[in-house]
Amino acid sequence: MKKDIDEIIIDICNQDPSFTIKNKYIRDIEYKCFDNDISNLSKLFSLASNYKGKEMLIFEDERYTYEDSHELASAFANALINEFKIKKGDRVAIASRNYPEWINSFIAITSIGAIAVPLNSWWTGEELKYGIENCGAKLIIVDNKRYDLISPFSKKLNLKLISIRSNKNQKNNWNNLIDIYKGLKMPNVDIKDDDDAAIFYTSGSTGYPKGVCSSHRAIISTLLQWSVIAGARAIRDEIIPDENIQPSCMITVPLFHVTGSHSQFMLSFLSGRKMVMLYKWDPSNALKIIESEKIISLSG
């Protein structure tokens, strides 16, 4: 008789040290928590070293390995600290469509203990102003369109903008900053499990969008739970993955939403999954890429 999925999950947590569960007190309340070496996002993203030579991200004609991405994020992290004096607990916003720089910026921000604030890139200028004032960020990473929307009020709010894929802001240009700090290692910052990691905004369907703050532990726990459940389903259904085929997914939703950021981007670091990102959704183009890149999964 086959075990049900709950029994398999218990077996995995008892047998695999990556999913060991212990009771821990968080703010004087006892919880069941994962107890392993991946205690914060910096440690999650450092798993890139386990996937040497593996492709991590494909965007149009650009291809990045896990090593490439970590090197870019490390350079940008050093720029944040040295050029903009960003320190642990500071809030740094990202206002951009899906680009590789979005992912590498998020890695850099959270790896130095700062708080990443993904802003809805579909917002109007006034909505972006609301979000920026609400979260308290003074440094914003922007693409061309968001630069045009934010720059009219940037001086009034004392904001600094870092431009990606743009020639409008040469002083604080993402590529220029990478060139300055290229080759430097990721700064070593003491990050606690329950330090704040990110603020994601709700849709605002009944009023203004609300910022939802997540700790490093909260995000890591979510990723580990998904990983355990996926593993349990594979065992139940007797699915044996082909080790010669790299897991892969197509990112079809905005990274400012947790579906894109958590279940597609960050979850990939637990398995060395390849991510393919589209400039915009086009069914015909997506089908071609699914075939050529041998995409296994997508959601949206």
Where are these regions (language model features)?
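ANL superfamily adenylate-forming
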Residues: 145-193, 208, 220
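Conserved AMP-binding/adenylation subdomain of ANL enzymes
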Residues: 220-248, 256-297
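A short helix-loop-beta submotif of the ANL/AMP-binding
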Residues: 90-91, 97-117, 121-125, 133-139, ...
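Flexible, non-catalytic linker and terminal segments flanking ANL/adenylate-forming cores
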Residues: 1-38, 60
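Conserved AMP-binding/adenylate-forming core of the ANL superfamily
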Residues: 33-37, 43, 53-87, 91-99, ...
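Conserved pre-ATP/AMP-binding loop-to-beta segment of ANL
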Residues: 183-201, 208, 238-248
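Conserved AMP-binding A3 loop
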Residues: 65-67, 197-225
